[in-house]
Amino acid sequence: MATNKERLFAPGALGPGSGYPGAGFPFAFPGALRGSPPFEMLSPSFRGLGQPDLPKEMASLSVETQSTSSEEMVPSSPSPPPPPRVYKPCFVCNDKSSGYHYGVSSCEGCKGFFRRSIQKNMVYTCHRDKNCIINKVTRNRCQYCRLQKCFEVGMSKEAVRNDRNKKKKEVKEEGSPDSYELSPQLEELITKVSKAHQETFPSLCQLGKYTTNSSADHRVQLDLGLWDKFSELATKCIIKIVEFAKRLPGFTGLSIADQITLLKAACLDILMLRICTRYTPEQDTMTFSDGLTLNRTQMHNAGFGPLTDLVFAFAGQLLPLEMDDTETGLLSAICLICGDRMDLEEPEKVDKLQEPLLEALRLYARRRRPSQPYMFPRMLMKITDLRGISTKGAERAITLKMEIPGPMPPLIREMLENPEMFEDDSSKPGPHPKASSEDEAPGGQGKRGQSPQPDQGP
């Protein structure tokens, strides 16, 4: 008999029309992904993005060519090739250096990390004492200390900016709509990502809204009825985010460990992005995927607490971008597939997978708004904002755990980076609460007599 974990990752288990497990679904990312035969049977759309073959001209670059002039009839000995240039080890992590980048000898990994950190204005946090050891093995564990080490050894911000300035001429030449023409490969990528997003997250116009009067007029510490409903919807949304990830080209070609790392790191970011795209400023409300619409006070009482105003402010900042479903899907994919996440086994492979997503969003956004070239960088900046909100969300979860009467729902626990922080030393009940058959039935009445629930998350 198949376990709950196997059903989640079995082919078609999350397809259209399938039911959801209740809020007590005992799912853990490592158990569900690592070594799960049904998961391994899934065939990704693009498994192992192959490296393009080198042009034939490149094959001869390392060989000293001989003269083929018809005037030279006497063969001459070829000149010996110059000895390979040897660089000092990477000043940051002591790995093999590929040359001098931004002022110091560095490897490709640290070069790319420093460039991305400066170009995206990334703000990192050290979870220890800001004195982590950075070497080839530990460099991906603390981004804050790695960036500080880059500065300490002499990497230059200005060198990164100057590198970007060299491309200004090329950017200026991109004045005609033809410059934003998408290649067939990018068109296909955009189609797949957009479809994956739309089929795991219906847009606001597709929903039949309904409201509740529960604690709508005044803020309280926690409305347990609203919390139960929100945690149920959040659980469903996490399942949908897993499905979205599995449908992204190349994602299942990553190692199982890296898939787990990326999902756990970005799940809360994507959940926040999704709910914020369903913000209605006229009523100051947010709508979930079953149509439930809550005002700001109710969102506070449902469990957001002190995080509420920050989330609503972010939702308001998204409005001027006027992102469509395709752009939201691409931004979600970029947020998920990011080589800067800690503890990745193959960050360079993840970066390689992210590059076409960045290019697709850049060209799509520019083609959609020819007179607004700044929209693409503004969208990317929202990823930094999302990470900040997610950090505060994890902190809120710690205090929330003390306010709810039972254990934190397991999927929400697994979404957070340190699930052990939710372990209760008291005598709280251990078994996960069982969901009623009414909750599990697609389209059935909820346990609180609410409107029919389609199989969607927030």
Curated annotation (Swiss-Prot):
<keyword id="KW-0863">Zinc-finger</keyword>
<keyword id="KW-0805">Transcription regulation</keyword>
<dbReference type="GO" id="GO:0048048">
    <property type="term" value="P:embryonic eye morphogenesis"/>
</dbReference>
<comment type="function">
    <text>Receptor for retinoic acid. Retinoic acid receptors bind as heterodimers to their target response elements in response to their ligands, all-trans or 9-cis retinoic acid, and regulate gene expression in various biological processes. The RAR/RXR heterodimers bind to the retinoic acid response elements (RARE) composed of tandem 5'-AGGTCA-3' sites known as DR1-DR5. In the absence of ligand, acts mainly as an activator of gene expression due to weak binding to corepressors. Required for limb bud development.</text>
</comment>
<keyword id="KW-0479">Metal-binding</keyword>
<dbReference type="GO" id="GO:1990830">
    <property type="term" value="P:cellular response to leukemia inhibitory factor"/>
</dbReference>
<dbReference type="GO" id="GO:0003682">
    <property type="term" value="F:chromatin binding"/>
</dbReference>
<dbReference type="InterPro" id="IPR000536">
    <property type="entry name" value="Nucl_hrmn_rcpt_lig-bd"/>
</dbReference>
<dbReference type="GO" id="GO:0048608">
    <property type="term" value="P:reproductive structure development"/>
</dbReference>
<dbReference type="GO" id="GO:0045944">
    <property type="term" value="P:positive regulation of transcription by RNA polymerase II"/>
</dbReference>
<dbReference type="GO" id="GO:0043066">
    <property type="term" value="P:negative regulation of apoptotic process"/>
</dbReference>
<dbReference type="GO" id="GO:0003406">
    <property type="term" value="P:retinal pigment epithelium development"/>
</dbReference>
<dbReference type="Pfam" id="PF00105">
    <property type="entry name" value="zf-C4"/>
</dbReference>
<dbReference type="GO" id="GO:0000785">
    <property type="term" value="C:chromatin"/>
</dbReference>
<feature type="region of interest" description="Disordered">
    <location>
        <begin position="409"/>
        <end position="458"/>
    </location>
</feature>
<keyword id="KW-0488">Methylation</keyword>
<dbReference type="GO" id="GO:0003700">
    <property type="term" value="F:DNA-binding transcription factor activity"/>
</dbReference>
<dbReference type="GO" id="GO:0070384">
    <property type="term" value="P:Harderian gland development"/>
</dbReference>
<dbReference type="GO" id="GO:0043010">
    <property type="term" value="P:camera-type eye development"/>
</dbReference>
<feature type="zinc finger region" description="NR C4-type">
    <location>
        <begin position="126"/>
        <end position="150"/>
    </location>
</feature>
<dbReference type="GO" id="GO:0008283">
    <property type="term" value="P:cell population proliferation"/>
</dbReference>
<dbReference type="GO" id="GO:0005634">
    <property type="term" value="C:nucleus"/>
</dbReference>
<keyword id="KW-0832">Ubl conjugation</keyword>
<dbReference type="GO" id="GO:0048732">
    <property type="term" value="P:gland development"/>
</dbReference>
<dbReference type="GO" id="GO:0006915">
    <property type="term" value="P:apoptotic process"/>
</dbReference>
<dbReference type="GO" id="GO:0003417">
    <property type="term" value="P:growth plate cartilage development"/>
</dbReference>
<dbReference type="GO" id="GO:0002068">
    <property type="term" value="P:glandular epithelial cell development"/>
</dbReference>
<dbReference type="GO" id="GO:0000977">
    <property type="term" value="F:RNA polymerase II transcription regulatory region sequence-specific DNA binding"/>
</dbReference>
<dbReference type="InterPro" id="IPR047159">
    <property type="entry name" value="NR_DBD_RAR"/>
</dbReference>
<dbReference type="GO" id="GO:0003677">
    <property type="term" value="F:DNA binding"/>
</dbReference>
<dbReference type="InterPro" id="IPR001723">
    <property type="entry name" value="Nuclear_hrmn_rcpt"/>
</dbReference>
<feature type="compositionally biased region" description="Polar residues">
    <location>
        <begin position="448"/>
        <end position="458"/>
    </location>
</feature>
<feature type="region of interest" description="Disordered">
    <location>
        <begin position="161"/>
        <end position="180"/>
    </location>
</feature>
<feature type="compositionally biased region" description="Polar residues">
    <location>
        <begin position="62"/>
        <end position="71"/>
    </location>
</feature>
<dbReference type="GO" id="GO:0001843">
    <property type="term" value="P:neural tube closure"/>
</dbReference>
<dbReference type="GO" id="GO:0010628">
    <property type="term" value="P:positive regulation of gene expression"/>
</dbReference>
<comment type="subunit">
    <text>Homodimer. Heterodimer with a RXR molecule. Binds DNA preferentially as a RAR/RXR heterodimer. Forms a complex with PUS1 and the SRA1 RNA in the nucleus.</text>
</comment>
<dbReference type="GO" id="GO:0060324">
    <property type="term" value="P:face development"/>
</dbReference>
<dbReference type="GO" id="GO:0060173">
    <property type="term" value="P:limb development"/>
</dbReference>
<keyword id="KW-1017">Isopeptide bond</keyword>
<dbReference type="GO" id="GO:0060041">
    <property type="term" value="P:retina development in camera-type eye"/>
</dbReference>
<protein>
    <recommendedName>
        <fullName>Retinoic acid receptor gamma</fullName>
    </recommendedName>
</protein>
